[in-house]
């Protein structure tokens, strides 16, 4: 990840096509709310699929708390649409097959040359695309006291 993208900095206002082909800017998707941006490896990855299954439950809690969610992957629009639909997700999935974000943020995953994905990141943004926290790795559900699942992060922050 670029060294200048730290808490307090402004995250770039990328404009990409969503799962329907419509061009969307991150700032427009965010509005005046906090937002979580998931930089995904893509629909081919079983770990990413599991992460997004967990995000389905979390998304309901986020909506009640006026927090936005967006997923960005290097999948083409067709794969992005199928991934979102297959999950029955109701938040925007953005498609970046030209790998604009991967190159700009310097997050190419060198371990998987066939799909050339991004290293997964989860970025928590305050209103105005201001970075609150950057997590490297996949969001996973971990057990908690009482047997309920709680979100946690695999990787480092």
Report residues per predicted region.
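Chalcogenol-based redox active-site neighborhoods
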Residues: 1-157
């Amino acid at each position: 990840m670029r060294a200048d993208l730290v808490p307090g900095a402004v995250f770039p206002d990328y404009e990409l096509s969503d799962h329907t082909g419509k061009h969307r800017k991150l700032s427009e998707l965010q509005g005046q709310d906090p937002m979580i941006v998931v930089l995904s490896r893509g629909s081919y990855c079983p770990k990413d699929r599991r992460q997004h299954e967990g995000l389905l439950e979390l998304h309901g809690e986020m909506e009640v708390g006026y927090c936005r969610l967006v997923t960005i992957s290097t999948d083409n629009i067709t794969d992005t649409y199928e991934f979102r639909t297959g999950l029955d997700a109701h938040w925007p999935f953005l498609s970046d097959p030209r790998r604009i974000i991967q190159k700009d943020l310097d997050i190419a995953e060198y371990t998987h040359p066939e799909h050339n994905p991004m290293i997964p990141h989860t970025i928590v943004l305050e209103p105005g695309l201001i970075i609150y926290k950057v997590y490297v790795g996949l969001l996973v559900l971990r057990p908690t006291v009482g047997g309920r699942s709680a979100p946690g992060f695999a990787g480092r922050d």
